[in-house]
Amino acid sequence: MNERERYESVRGCKWVDEVVEDAPYVTTLEIMDQYGCEVCIHGDDLSIGADGKDTYQIVKDAGRFVECRRTQGVSTTELVGRMLLMSKDHSEPTEEDSSENQDEEESKVERKKAKVENFAGKNPESPYTAGVSHFLTTSKRVLQFSNSKEPQPDDRVIYVDGGFDLYHLGHIEFLREAKKLGDYLLVGVHDDETIRKVRGPNFPLMSLNERVLSVLSCRYVDEVVIGAPYSVTKDVLEKIYKVNVVAHGTNSVLLDSDQQDPYKLPKELGIYQTIETQSSGITYNTIIERIVSNRLAYEERNRKKVAKELAAIEAANQSEAKE
């Protein structure tokens, strides 16, 4: 994404209060003081600048740095690898998939091998992203993302649904406009099997857990229906909350497995509405196209990143040995 797209994506996060545009890559005390920041927080993966040094060393030396654990199973590098390889081994297996585990084992090994050879190249993998496990969601994690907010009796409840794969700025813009239609935004997220039936066996690239938490992180979303049906049903409209409006964007709607319009019921009830968004132009397809067309650049960037991380760790180890 370009810088403008990244600024707006971060603004869409419900935990963000202010975005500092054109921030320096190496965090300084001056920039922290300018924006009234007491501490700087970063994950436990090492961030290396062009000079090979820790980009947070200044704030660490000043005692104003806080480290948090990197979320297990979440890796930009791995996600890019998924896009390049269109692998589906990250998705949750269905009963049918499980019965074919033995036959699939060798192909899974080959796919993982291809991730290393085709994306990371011959260099060693990053110590922070190598062997990334599947992202596992706990009830505690969901509660951390949830608003725990119920609609008020007079609130106008809006329902939208989708796969929200590769959650991006286009999704954020759509959700922002949907929220403007009422007071409470309820979002249905389809499960992996449903998406595969509609879009094909290589979809989605993100698992249901990843997609649900991505949507819950949006500041415009109040609640999520996990594993929502592809076609909007009476249960969706009445049993969770009383839905006043069902909305969808201007993109084409794929028919359900019975070749029916998934929005047939809300259209018949007169509560369906199309949302026009001032789109950034970002879609699932444009992201894939960007990644694939810049494949060589991503591979080279990854090799350099790995080399820097390994060099920094080696230097730190040598320093400790001397002490």
Predicted regions and their residues:
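Nucleotidyltransferase catalytic core that binds NTPs
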Residues: M1-E323
